[in-house]
Amino acid sequence: MKRYLTIIYGAASYLVFLVAFGYAIGFVGDVVVPRTVDHAIAAPIGQAVVVNLVLLGVFAVQHSVMARQGFKRWWTRFVPPSIERSTYVLLASVALLLLYWQWRTMPAVIWDVRQPAGRVALWALFWLGWATVLTSTFMINHFELFGLRQVYLAWRGKPYTEIGFQAHLLYRWVRHPIMLGFVVAFWATPMMTAGHLLFAIGATGYILVALQFEERDLLAALGDQYRDYRREVSMLLPWPHRHT
């Protein structure tokens, strides 16, 4: 019974992630979904800035603290290791859904590209960014990243085994193509409002800080293998002179 509950929990967490990820595209792009970065709850500008920063902070703290090895060691004293990743994914998704629900509109326009070719180019970059995010997850192990492999192994009664480090496709050009895709998607917009700008700056700043912690953990886990990889491949921008 426990094995079935484990895989049901992992699948449910993944479904919540899919909802949060799909909504993120509409939220940032201001398309399809009812509440977006440009059309959310009306509020005075001061209140909007504070609330939006708190929402970004909640996601940042959850996402970074729960990803650290020290927290994982403590957390798995209470949560079975097989669902640790699924729980992380679930809580990160809930933090995003909270952000979508409580975001405050900041409607002042920073830029508005009216030239058709410019709009098409920016929309193309927007979709390219999201496509990069999604496809990059499969270039490592999508199912491991979102906890499905862990719960599947538990369901089968098999021990968990680490997946070795390999740099495939985009990972041969940048160390963090998922984060690169997010940054491109957050900034590529024909119309940048103050709210969207706050979101883009906050999210990009968080990514740059969080990557420092991620790199430290990877160095600790992989040692010289990752140290050599860092020397050969840029973190976010695919500089050709570093690629070998």
Curated annotation (Swiss-Prot):
The chain crosses the membrane at residues 7-27, 41-61, 90-110, 120-140, 181-201. GO terms for molecular function: methyltransferase activity. One of its GO terms (cellular component) is membrane. It is found in: Membrane. GO terms for biological process: methylation. Keywords: Membrane, Methyltransferase, S-adenosyl-L-methionine, Transferase, Transmembrane, Transmembrane helix. Coiled coil: none annotated. It catalyses: methanethiol + S-adenosyl-L-methionine = dimethyl sulfide + S-adenosyl-L-homocysteine + H(+). Its EC number is 2.1.1.334. Catalyzes the methylation of methanethiol (MeSH) to yield dimethylsulphide (DMS). Belongs to the nurim family. PANTHER family: NURIM. This is Methanethiol S-methyltransferase. The gene is mddA.
